């Protein structure tokens, strides 16, 4: 397609149509039977590699990563978590997950509220000061955010405050440190030295992360990719992902 014709097509078709067309083209280009992305429903020859070189990592259609696909697997198994008349918060919403989660909420009459500190088309939601009443949120998904917050314990307490008595918060963080203690940083220099990223404040040990969640008032169930059927793990290209399923530990 010539540059002139491409520019005319962009003028004639709405952005949403163009995005949908590009997605369908990617789906056709990468179609196969070996893998499946449960975030966008695409059947794939392979997932794309991570920039670090790790193979079969990124969905070429929607951009989902293994942690997202583990969370979707859990949510698709636990349809009862989507409550008619309730509300779901999606913190720092991943573009690849938003359409599927919005549809799952819409099907049961549940409000879907995507938001964070940044992000086009999302509410401004600060995990330290959520604009919701106590016990008013029924479901929350928050991936790789708490490890980037200077005061993660305050954020955990705020999440606990807004969760309904029967609510569920899925709070994922990246791969756990295998040493004795969580790696915690307080300065930019420390963050760059430890993680090569000024936005990351810590790398938890699994035990410490669970302890912090429990101290904030949650019952914690650990949902591990390695416990799933091997065929599903292979199709979704899950690694050693872990999902912490958090529910309020008694009334406030």
Annotated model-derived regions:
Residues 91, 140-141:
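Hydrophobic beta-strand segment of the Class I
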Residues 117, 142, 174-176:
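An acidic- and aromatic-residue-enriched active-site/binding cleft used to recognize and process polar
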């Amino acid at each position: 397609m010539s540059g002139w014709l491409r520019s005319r097509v962009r003028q004639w078709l709405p952005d949403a149509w163009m995005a949908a067309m590009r997605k369908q083209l990617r789906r056709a280009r990468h179609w196969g039977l070996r893998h499946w992305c449960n975030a966008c429903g695409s059947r794939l020859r392979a997932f794309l590699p991570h920039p670090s070189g790790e193979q079969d990592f990124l969905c070429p259609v929607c951009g989902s990563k293994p942690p997202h696909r583990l969370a979707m697997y859990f949510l698709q198994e636990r349809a009862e978590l989507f409550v008619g008349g309730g509300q779901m918060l999606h913190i720092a919403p991943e573009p690849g997950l938003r359409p599927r989660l919005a549809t799952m909420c819409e099907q049961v009459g549940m409000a879907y509220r995507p938001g964070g500190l940044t992000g086009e088309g999302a509410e401004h939601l600060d995990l330290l000061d959520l604009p919701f009443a106590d016990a008013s949120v029924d479901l929350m998904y928050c991936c790789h955010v708490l490890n980037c917050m200077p005061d993660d314990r305050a954020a955990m307490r705020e999440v606990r405050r807004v969760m309904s008595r029967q609510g569920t918060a899925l709070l994922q963080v990246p791969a756990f440190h295998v040493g004795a203690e969580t790696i915690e940083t307080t300065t930019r220099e420390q963050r760059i030295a430890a993680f090569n990223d000024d936005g990351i404040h810590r790398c938890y040990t699994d035990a410490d992360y669970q302890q912090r969640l429990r101290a904030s008032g949650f019952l914690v169930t650990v949902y591990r990719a390695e416990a799933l059927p091997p065929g599903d793990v292979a199709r979704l290209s899950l690694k050693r992902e872990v999902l912490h399923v958090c529910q309020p530990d008694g009334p406030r």
